[in-house]
């Protein structure tokens, strides 16, 4: 079957996974350089073979391609983490990508924003474009200004920072909780959800600093992270440990009140984590959101792609299609998702996977069809 593509007359949406791994990425260096006698990591070691390609997982990131009201395709990148440039070098040519019309940043962690400097490759000497529009929360903008002042004010650039010069050229846009915005004048609508009372919790942080030798007694607050709903066709939730109840009415419905076609949802590993959903939490959220298709992302190295496929097949059918004996990891994963209704479509994403949403809401992709 040939790769699905966004047809000229289509009013649908493409989504390409640039990265599906947590901040550490895969493979892990400690796994590839393990000492004799140490337990081998099947997931990381498999990346050294062609068969293990889907276990190579860069920082979570994706590209949305959707037709604007003028008929032109608009390219939106979600998050530019520590290995964004490597992901772009691999996947942009393969998918015919070049100009970036907008960048959306979910939160101010390194795996979401440390690739901002690499965007100079697009604006350097105006070879591709004179600037890139970047959409962030006020809190994220403040952190970018603190961490990379030359990206916000070019007088901080050591080389001078001429327009179309040696530093990236950005136009910054501050976006707000539950306030839909348009990507320039394209007609493309994005709804961010974060902030109080609506918030995606991505771990926790403390309200004050503790002395190094003492435990903090300060109040613990959720660390808030943006999710995005784009054109009522895609919900993106890459870094989340909890979805509050008042978020669900936003993310459960697509066009005309139908289920949203595609949900991209965090799943670090089998067990729960302070900053990320574990498998049981992810599947429970997927069942509640009720998207036509849910793609899991943000994986560590504890579970291989093949094992996630087996587990999610069980979620959908109540049985697996695998003809081989189940691994211990698969058995544990299936045990964790027992008790809920079957019939939902969930699969692990992988770097380079392309998902196509037709204007009618039907969904196909390049791996599962």
Model-derived regions: residue spans:
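Residue-level signal for inorganic ion chemistry
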Residues: 15, 144, 294
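Core dinuclear metal-dependent hydrolase active-site scaffold
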Residues: 2-91, 95, 165-249, 350-369
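Active-site flanking residues adjacent to catalytic metal/cofactor-binding acidic residues
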Residues: 78, 106, 237-238, 265, ...
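Active-site neighborhood of divalent metal-dependent phosphoester bond hydrolases
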Residues: 128-132, 138-172, 304, 310
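Short mixed-charge
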Residues: 152-175, 179-181, 320-340
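Active-site metal-binding motif and surrounding structural segment of the metallo-beta-lactamase
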Residues: 67-77, 81-136, 257, 261
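Binuclear metal-ion centers of metallo-dependent hydrolases, dominated by the metallo-beta-lactamase
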Residues: 244-369
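Structured loop/turn residues at beta-strand edges in well-structured enzyme cores
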Residues: 95-98, 168, 186-188, 256-258, ...
